[in-house]
Amino acid sequence: MKNTIEHPKVFISYAWGSEDYRLKVRSLATDLMGDGIDVLLDQWSLKEGNDTYAFMEQSVTDSTITNVLILLDPIYEKKANGRHGGVGTETQIISPEIYNKVKQEKFLPVIFERGENGEIPKPQYLKTMLHF
């Protein structure tokens, strides 16, 4: 059964940074849940022995996920553009979805942390998308 907008479910895509940064991500997820949004977050869902890449692929392609919140920061931008780590894997999965569906609303870029000089750290595949 597919979720409706009345009961949204989001997956949070982000680059692992410092422990403080992961706490900030977890705080956002907790706030969203407090607002009635189901949240899929690796910090809560992945367990020892799980395949992280399979988790990312399933989370991004899951039809019950109404939105993928892409939390942008300089580390995310660098990893996405270089196709490194988990962010690079997610970028390879997400970018065709964005390019093939010009009016898509599932993948939402969120400026979570700006660069040192206040710049918006958008990876190349998100450059033309409006952001939060």
Report the location of each language-model feature.
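Alpha-helical scaffold elements adjacent to nucleotide-binding pockets in ATP/GTP-utilizing enzyme cores
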Residues: 27-28, 55, 59, 86-93, ...
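Conserved TIR/SEFIR loop-to-helix hotspot centered on a Trp-containing motif
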Residues: 51, 74-100
